[in-house]
Regions:
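Bacterial Sec-dependent N-terminal signal peptides
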Residues: 1-24, 387
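Outer-membrane beta-barrel biogenesis signature
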Residues: 19-47, 219-238, 251-254, 357-361
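Outer-membrane beta-barrel domain signature
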Residues: 23-25, 36, 63-67, 104-109, ...
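Short sequence motifs at beta-strands and strand-loop junctions characteristic
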Residues: 26-28, 68-71, 111-113, 161-165, ...
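Outer membrane beta-barrel
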Residues: 32-195, 201-218, 237-240, 247, ...
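Detector for outer-membrane/organellar transmembrane beta-barrel domains
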Residues: 203, 213-216, 221-335
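Outer-membrane beta-barrel "beta-signal"
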Residues: 208-219, 350-356, 361, 375-387
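Outer membrane beta-barrel transmembrane domains
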Residues: 254, 317-364
Length: 387
């Protein structure tokens, strides 16, 4: 963790030195980070900090056991802006809580703190079309692409945790077209093993992802199609529908970009070709929000230990004018075949939120009933603070 504190300290010093030596104007507002921009418009830089404090308790119905924990769920340091010209943008994000860094304790990630979430350059080489290069989120399901700062519930659903594509390093091409009816397209080629992997790409596997979206009623206010809850209270009905197909060739991880690296008794990687379909929709109007997602992962070989399965999640919520919200969510996941590492489960969740300053300062709670091999009831309370 010493290196993490060094990064934070260096970042603060960098901002201060730029301000003192160059007298670059600093702009700061709640929830928008600290922003600086060169007088000659040669670069801009925004620094943001946020964290989530989570209490979680679980009551197991058969045994009667009660487990609880209190922890810093996420702690993030974010940089973004443009370099040289406004059409060359960048984003860097570090995850520095223990929960953020724990995935680095394996050979394939070098037994180091896996703190780098995003490190990507975005070049808009023609209006409406961007080339992304680096490590960032793949164009997967909507629930995953929505920032963890902007979630409607305390955390994402089981469908997301079992089937999302997460982050990887590679190239992405993204386009936006239309004004009344809006279309978005994305195509990505990535390494296929997930973020932070330092070993050679095994067996020359690659991952190919394509996504198509349509917004038949036009753009959402304040990019509300990728924000949980309708805190903007969309003045007119808005709908977005998205479809993603992902093919991960020769992946040694149980869920493609995530999960365990699978090996045989001779410590050789085991591979599978994973095909994943993700379909999602979101509707918002005057504080009312509805969203749904379907996921399906399969393979022609079905090697034991991989996460073949399907899942569905839907949620309905309403934000009152007082900025309190009540929301409900239903989730179901099922394995496909006898070799899947995914277990069947159903989850029913009721959530309550108070948005004090939008998603930048909020308190959220939810209670869930989990119907699985070991049924339990879970209660969570989380505070989010973003500067």
């Amino acid at each position: 963790m010493r290196g993490v504190f060094t990064v934070v300290f260096f970042s603060v010093c960098l901002f201060y030195s730029e301000y003192v030596q160059a007298q670059i104007p600093i702009d700061a507002s709640w929830g928008k980070g600290i922003r600086v921009e060169a007088k000659d418009s040669s670069f801009s830089l925004k620094l943001g900090l946020r964290f989530q404090t989570l209490y979680e308790g679980e009551k197991y119905l058969e045994s009667g056991n009660w487990n609880e924990q209190l922890l810093i769920r996420r702690y993030r340091l974010k940089f973004d802006g443009y370099a040289f010209k406004p059409n060359i943008k960048y984003k860097m994000e570090l995850g520095i809580s223990n929960r953020d860094t724990r995935s680095g304790g394996v050979d394939e990630i070098g037994h180091t703190a896996n703190i780098v979430l995003d490190a990507v350059v975005k070049w808009e080489f023609t209006p409406g079309v961007e080339l992304w290069v680096g490590q960032t989120k793949l164009p997967g399901n909507r629930e995953r692409v929505v920032s963890s700062q902007n979630m409607q519930f305390v955390d994402r659903s089981l469908v997301n945790s079992r089937f999302n594509l997460d982050r990887d390093i590679g190239f992405q091409l993204r386009a936006v077209q239309g004004s009344g009816v809006v279309f978005r397209e994305a195509f990505a080629i990535s390494m296929g093993e997930g973020r932070g992997v330092v070993v050679d790409n095994p067996d020359n596997g690659r991952q190919y992802t394509t996504r198509f979206e349509v917004l038949p009623m036009g753009l959402f206010k304040s990019k509300g199609d990728y924000v949980g809850a309708d805190i903007e209270r969309q003045p007119s009905p808005k709908l977005a529908i998205g479809v993603t197909y992902d093919y991960n060739k020769n992946t040694p991880r149980s869920r493609g970009n995530l999960g365990s690296f699978l090996m045989d008794t001779d410590n050789n990687f085991i591979y599978s070709d994973l095909s994943t379909w993700l379909v999602d929709a979101v509707f918002k109007y005057q504080g009312l929000s509805w969203n749904a997602e379907y996921a399906h992962r399969s393979s022609s070989d079905e090697v034991a230990g991989f996460g073949y399965g399907k899942g569905f999640v839907t949620a309905l919520g309403y934000v009152f004018k007082s900025n309190y919200e009540i929301a409900g969510r239903y989730t179901t996941v099922e394995p496909i075949g006898v070799n899947s590492s995914i277990g069947a489960a159903e989850e029913y969740t009721l959530g309550f939120s108070k948005y004090i300053v939008g998603h930048s300062l909020k308190i959220q709670s939810d209670v869930s009933y989990m119907d699985t091999t070991n049924d339990y009831i879970r209660f969570r309370v989380q505070m989010e603070l973003a500067l």
